[in-house]
């Protein structure tokens, strides 16, 4: 994976266009077989529609890119097979919950998910619900995913004005710090209480990061790169 590069931007210009994905068309049979195998392993996986990015450009404090619609099975195969189509990227938003004592709150993904055991901020691959007109609304995507996973709504946090875009070649994580006026312990307890009320929670737990010693190998490199940049040297 490419060494993470962090771009700080204030504006996202993400258009949604109609276009074919040759990777998905040319390898359809292989993709379907791969998804069938993954679905046997994780029966709750669903082949919905997602949005994949192309041509990310960072300039003048802005990230510009175009997105197109694809099926989740094709996206999953592309990811699992080492990103064979180099012309596209996985561009998604993340809400970096930060408590008033400086702790970051990350989710531990449940065993039934495609990323079981991984630890990262609430997020999700953009889908059709995140389209506004002919544009992708990453801010809305973050708010939706955060509420679904943790129960927190925009009334519970104060969002910073800018995004930290962590670019690692096949992915761009658009991370915005969301400041919550409670301690890390209280924030974790609130999220865990919400998880206990959910019938099928996406998260299995909450992991707090206060220092580099709290980072683990279960976190994607783009997450640890972002957190390291926020913590004291």
Residue ranges of predicted features:
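N-terminal leader/linker segments that precede catalytic domains of diphosphate-processing enzymes
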Residues: 1-120, 125-144, 152-233
């Amino acid at each position: 994976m490419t060494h993470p590069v962090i771009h700080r931007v204030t504006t996202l210009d993400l258009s949604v266009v109609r276009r074919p994905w040759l990777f998905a068309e040319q390898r359809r049979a292989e993709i379907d077989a791969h998804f069938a195998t993954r679905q046997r392993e994780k029966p709750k996986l669903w082949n919905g529609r997602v949005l994949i990015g192309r041509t990310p450009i960072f300039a003048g404090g802005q990230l510009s890119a175009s997105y197109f619609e694809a099926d989740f099975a094709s996206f999953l195969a592309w990811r699992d097979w080492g990103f064979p189509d180099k012309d596209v990227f996985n561009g998604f938003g993340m809400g970096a919950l930060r408590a008033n004592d400086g702790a970051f709150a990350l989710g531990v993904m449940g065993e039934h998910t495609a990323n079981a055991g991984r630890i990262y901020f609430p997020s999700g691959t953009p889908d059709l619900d995140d389209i506004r007109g002919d544009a992708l609304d990453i801010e809305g995507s973050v708010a939706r995913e955060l509420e679904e996973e943790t129960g927190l709504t925009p009334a519970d946090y104060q969002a910073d004005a800018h995004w930290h875009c962590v670019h690692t070649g096949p992915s761009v994580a658009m991370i915005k710090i969301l400041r919550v006026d409670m301690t890390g312990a209280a924030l974790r307890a609130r999220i865990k209480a919400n998880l206990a009320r959910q019938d099928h929670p996406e998260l299995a737990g909450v992991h707090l990061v206060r220092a580099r010693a709290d980072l683990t190998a279960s976190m994607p490199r783009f997450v640890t790169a972002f957190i390291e940049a926020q913590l004291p040297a």
